[in-house]
Design a protein with these regions (language model features):
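Active-site-adjacent structural segments surrounding the nucleophilic cysteine of cysteine proteases
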Residues: 2-132, 181-187, 202
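Residues that form generic nucleotide/phosphate-binding pockets
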Residues: 48, 117, 138, 142, ...
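Short, flexible active-site-adjacent loop segments at beta-strand->alpha-helix junctions, enriched
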Residues: 94, 174, 212
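Mid-length scaffold segments of soluble, non-membrane domains
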Residues: 123-156, 160-165
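Repeat-unit-sized solenoid/scaffold elements
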Residues: 128-129, 165-183, 230-250
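Active-site-adjacent substructure of cysteine-protease-like catalytic cores
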Residues: 153-207
Length: 254
C-alpha cells in the first residue's frame, strides 16, 4: 500500500511540474516532448517500485534481461584530445573485461588501463580506429579471451547472448545513434563503439554502456535504431564511409 502511495505521489508531482516549469509561451512540440519525458520518468519509477515480473517467451528467452557492471568512460578525465577522442574501442573492451573479472574502477585506473591497451595496439601497428577483427585480436592476445564475430546479427541473436550474461560489443555509426542520444557532440561520431548489456521487449529497447559520454551508463536505444547503426569500420579506411561497413558484432568469451 505504501509503495502505491509513493507511486501516485510521484505521478502527481511529475504532472504538476509539467505546468509549473513551462514558460508562458510554449509550442505544442515542447508540450509533447515534456509529456513524453514525464511518462518515461513515471515508467522508470513504477519499474523501480513495482518491477514487472520477467516472462519467458515462446522463443525460450526472457522478455527482459540486464547485465550489471561498472561503467567505463572512454575519456575518464573529460579530455577529448587524442587518444581519448577515439578510445571508444578500448573502453568497450575494458567494459567486458571488468565485467568478467568483477573489477571496480576509478578515473585514474581507467585512464591507465586504456593507455596500456593502446601501447599493446601500437605493437600491432593499429591506428586510432580499430575494426572488429582487430578488436577481437586485442581481446584474445591482450585480455586473454576467446572471441566470436557475428555477421549480420539479429535482435534475437543479441538477446540470446545477453540472456546468458554475455555482453555484446558493437561498432556503429554514431551519427545514427545521435537520433536517440543527444549527449553526443557535433551530431555524434562517424565511428563509435559501445557494449550491449541488456534488453527490454516491453519497451523494444537495448540497454548499453555507451562509453562515449558521461551519461552513457545503461543508456537505452530502440532495437531498430541500434541494429540500423551497426557497422564495422569501412574497407575504404574513411570514417565518412561508415554505412558501407559490414554489420558485425564482437563476443568475448571466458
Amino acid at each position: 500500500m505504501f509503495k502505491k502511495v509513493i507511486l501516485v505521489a510521484v505521478i502527481l508531482l511529475s504532472v504538476f511540474s509539467l505546468f509549473l516549469f513551462f514558460p508562458k509561451k510554449i509550442t505544442p512540440e515542447k508540450i509533447e516532448n515534456k509529456i513524453n519525458q514525464t511518462v518515461e520518468k513515471i515508467d522508470e519509477v513504477k519499474e523501480t517500485i513495482i518491477p514487472k515480473p520477467t516472462v519467458i517467451l515462446e522463443s525460450g528467452l526472457p522478455n527482459k534481461h540486464l547485465i550489471s557492471t561498472v561503467f567505463v568512460e572512454q575519456s575518464p578525465e573529460k579530455n577529448w584530445d587524442q587518444p581519448w577522442q577515439d578510445a571508444c574501442e578500448e573502453a568497450s573492451l575494458l567494459t567486458v573485461d571488468f565485467y568478467y573479472t568483477n573489477k571496480t574502477t576509478t578515473s585514474e585506473f581507467t585512464k591507465e588501463s586504456i593507455l596500456n591497451m593502446i601501447s599493446f595496439e601500437e605493437t600491432r601497428n593499429y591506428t586510432h580506429d580499430m575494426n572488429i577483427s582487430q578488436m577481437a585480436t586485442v581481446g584474445e592476445d591482450y585480455l586473454g579471451y576467446k572471441s566470436e564475430i557475428i555477421d549480420n546479427p539479429t535482435i534475437d541473436q543479441i538477446k540470446k547472448y545477453i540472456s546468458q550474461n554475455i555482453p555484446v560489443i558493437v561498432t556503429a555509426n554514431g551519427k545514427t545513434l545521435y537520433a536517440e542520444n543527444k549527449h553526443f557532440k557535433s551530431g555524434g561520431p562517424y565511428y563509435h563503439s559501445a557494449v550491449i548489456l541488456g534488453y527490454d521487449d516491453d519497451k523494444q529497447q537495448f540497454i548499453v554502456h555507451d562509453v562515449g559520454t558521461q551519461f552513457g551508463a545503461y543508456f537505452h536505444y530502440s532495437y531498430s535504431l541500434l541494429i540500423e547503426s551497426i557497422h564495422d569500420f569501412p574497407d575504404s579506411g574513411k570514417k565518412e564511409d561508415i554505412n558501407s561497413g559490414q554489420k558485425r558484432v564482437l563476443i568475448l568469451l571466458k
